[in-house]
Swiss-Prot record:
<dbReference type="GO" id="GO:0051082">
    <property type="term" value="F:unfolded protein binding"/>
</dbReference>
<feature type="disulfide bond" description="Redox-active">
    <location>
        <begin position="236"/>
        <end position="238"/>
    </location>
</feature>
<keyword id="KW-0862">Zinc</keyword>
<dbReference type="InterPro" id="IPR016153">
    <property type="entry name" value="Heat_shock_Hsp33_N"/>
</dbReference>
<keyword id="KW-0963">Cytoplasm</keyword>
<keyword id="KW-0143">Chaperone</keyword>
<dbReference type="InterPro" id="IPR016154">
    <property type="entry name" value="Heat_shock_Hsp33_C"/>
</dbReference>
<comment type="function">
    <text>Redox regulated molecular chaperone. Protects both thermally unfolding and oxidatively damaged proteins from irreversible aggregation. Plays an important role in the bacterial defense system toward oxidative stress.</text>
</comment>
<dbReference type="InterPro" id="IPR000397">
    <property type="entry name" value="Heat_shock_Hsp33"/>
</dbReference>
<keyword id="KW-1015">Disulfide bond</keyword>
<dbReference type="GO" id="GO:0044183">
    <property type="term" value="F:protein folding chaperone"/>
</dbReference>
<dbReference type="Pfam" id="PF01430">
    <property type="entry name" value="HSP33"/>
</dbReference>
<keyword id="KW-0676">Redox-active center</keyword>
<protein>
    <recommendedName>
        <fullName>33 kDa chaperonin</fullName>
    </recommendedName>
</protein>
<comment type="similarity">
    <text>Belongs to the HSP33 family.</text>
</comment>
<feature type="disulfide bond" description="Redox-active">
    <location>
        <begin position="269"/>
        <end position="272"/>
    </location>
</feature>
<dbReference type="GO" id="GO:0005737">
    <property type="term" value="C:cytoplasm"/>
</dbReference>
Length: 292
């Protein structure tokens, strides 16, 4: 079974929930970027979150960007998703290695450090919606829980996980459960109780538990209903034309310098590492068409 996102409602629509299996997507990102295990886990968690949050977008052409910037060795993470859960992303420093933390786990908290999380929703309006909050733990799931509470005023629980062994990514996924207006205190209390000691989501996924089963474990007795199930994948939208526009955007002075150098130019996409080569003749054509 491939990666996918499931969206559910429960408790007469006062709870909405999203579950994700993203093992293949995270493994592909790790391979494309040559990520260390700790960078794989950090980027994978963020990509999983973006995939689920893309199903909160209303318009077909809407886009979601999650930016994390920390003072730890990873530096930062950028992930973009469209409304169809086509996700792409990169980490600033892909080859970070740190000792395991006191629980014997990958120390993402130290790798990310303290800083901020930025969520940008581009809905095709003049200005995108931008939400900002602090990184409170660097673990990403806790940071998004805090973001939803403070920036969007939506009480939420976010769980994200990436399980890695010597062969690579063997389990990745997550869930987001949110309280909507009208949610009863009893519902909130039941969920809080179930979350105490809840198994690791990446371990559950690696053992074959589906996102639906995970959400049903959390929402049992609340009449959970599946709203939609959609595929989720690593997909970049870079093209040679887009890279040519990037070349043009560097400005007349720098473009002329590249032309006069006579060697052409090589541009590389941050998101998928695809390289685009522009010969000296290509640069000459770009200069003729765009430099007056």
């Amino acid at each position: 079974m491939g990666d996918y996102i499931v969206r559910m409602t429960a408790a007469q629509g006062t709870v909405r929930a999203f579950g994700a299996m993203t093992t293949e997507m995270v493994g592909q990102a790790a391979e494309i970027h040559g990520l260390s295990p700790i960078a794989t886990a950090a980027l994978g968690r963020t990509m999983t979150a973006a995939g689920m949050m893309s199903k909160m977008l209303k318009g077909e052409n809407d886009k979601l960007t999650i930016q994390l910037k920390g003072d730890g060795p990873l530096g930062g993470i950028v992930v973009v998703s469209d409304s169809k859960a086509n996700v792409r992303g990169y980490v600033h420093n892909p080859n970070v290695y740190l000792p395991l933390n006191e629980r014997g786990k990958l120390d993402i908290r130290t790798a990310m450090g303290y800083g901020y999380i930025n969520v940008i929703r581009d809905m095709g309006l003049k200005e995108p919606y931008i939400g900002l909050s602090q990184l409170v733990s660097g673990e990403i799931a806790d940071d998004l829980t805090y973001y939803f509470a403070t920036s969007e005023q939506v009480p939420s629980t976010v769980a994200l996980g990436v399980l890695i062994d010597a062969t690579g990514v063997i389990g990745a996924g997550g869930f987001i459960v949110q309280m909507m207006p009208g949610a009863e205190e009893e519902t909130v209390a039941t969920l809080e109780k179930r979350l105490i000691g809840f198994p690791s989501v990446s371990k559950l996924i690696s053992e074959g538990t589906t996102p639906e089963q995970i959400l049903n474990m959390l929402l049992e007795g609340m009449e959970p209903k599946i709203v939609e199930t959609v595929p989720c994948s690593f997909k970049c939208n870079c093209t040679r034309e887009r890279m040519e526009r990037n070349l043009i955007s560097i400005g007349k002075k720098d473009l002329l310098e590249i032309f006069e150098d006579g060697k052409g130019a090589e541009l590389q996409c941050h998101f998928c590492n695809t390289k685009y080569n522009f010969s000296h003749q290509d640069i000459e054509n770009i200069v003729k068409e765009n430099v007056k």
